[in-house]
């Protein structure tokens, strides 16, 4: 009994320390990104509004893990001015401290301006945060389109215990209405999050779609992650998701290649 207690304590401490490491040092890891094909002309009202948006998200992220913005959206203004409006949001993983959230968002802003120069719309997902802006008002509108998925090359066959634990974790994640949730069953762990402007029912629906794609697209993979436009879900078998060295799911090390091969963002 004493040995069992010590093992459980060590497992808890390992999980806690791993999660803490993931919360800060891994938050900058690139997941996916996309740019709209339409480009704006430099030194125009849209560029000014976009720069205001990007400056606002950096300021806000030091105090809040989520916020949305509509810049230049004045219904009383001319049509040319309203077409220069920028709608956007940012979100950090809720387990990040405000200081780490701010660093992640600053990193996202730096990257998105380099990767999507003069784009009317752009989206960037890092391990710890998400940034998106468009000229169309997408805020609060449900979108479950698939943006990115990764399945481990290692799979599990005929392991009833693993699949039961995995399904327990996914069922728990799928039921959340709180925006962010961490779950564990036995040696299987996972977490999920919705964008902060979703209603509880839309969050649950988005996560149900994400979990369904995890099962359908990744099958018996020992670890997998699926990102939809407004939510994501991950799971992994303990010991496979190596927090100390980043993903162990054969992530492409080239930021440019990952970004370039993505399809254009869908426009509203």
What function would you assign to each model-found segment?
Residues 1-268:
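Extracellular secretory-pathway ectodomains and N-terminal mature segments of eukaryotic proteins
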């Amino acid at each position: 009994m004493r040995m069992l207690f010590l093992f459980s304590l060590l497992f808890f401490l390992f999980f806690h320390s791993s999660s803490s490491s993931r919360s800060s040092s891994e938050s900058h890891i690139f997941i996916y990104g996309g740019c709209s094909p339409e480009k704006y002309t430099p030194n125009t009202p849209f560029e000014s509004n976009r720069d205001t948006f990007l400056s606002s998200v950096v300021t806000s992220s030091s105090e809040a893990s989520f916020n949305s913005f509509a810049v230049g959206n004045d219904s009383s203004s001319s049509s040319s001015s309203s077409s220069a409006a920028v709608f956007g949001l940012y979100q950090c993983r809720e387990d990040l401290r405000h200081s780490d959230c701010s660093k992640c968002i600053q990193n996202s802003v730096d990257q998105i301006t380099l990767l999507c120069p003069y784009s009317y719309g752009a989206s960037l997902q890092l391990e710890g945060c998400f940034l998106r802006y468009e000229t169309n008002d997408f805020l609060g509108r449900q979108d479950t389109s698939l943006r990115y998925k990764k399945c481990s090359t290692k799979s599990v066959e005929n392991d009833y215990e693993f699949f039961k634990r995995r399904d327990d974790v996914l069922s728990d994640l799928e039921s959340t209405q709180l925006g962010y949730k961490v779950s564990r069953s036995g040696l299987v762990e996972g977490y999920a999050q919705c964008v902060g402007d979703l209603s509880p029912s839309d969050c649950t629906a988005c996560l149900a779609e994400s979990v369904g794609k995890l099962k359908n697209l990744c099958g018996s993979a020992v670890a997998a992650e699926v990102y939809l436009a407004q939510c994501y879900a991950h799971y992994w078998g303990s010991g496979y998701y190596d927090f100390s060295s980043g993903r162990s799911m054969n992530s492409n090390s080239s930021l440019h290649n990952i970004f370039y091969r993505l399809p254009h963002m869908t426009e509203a």
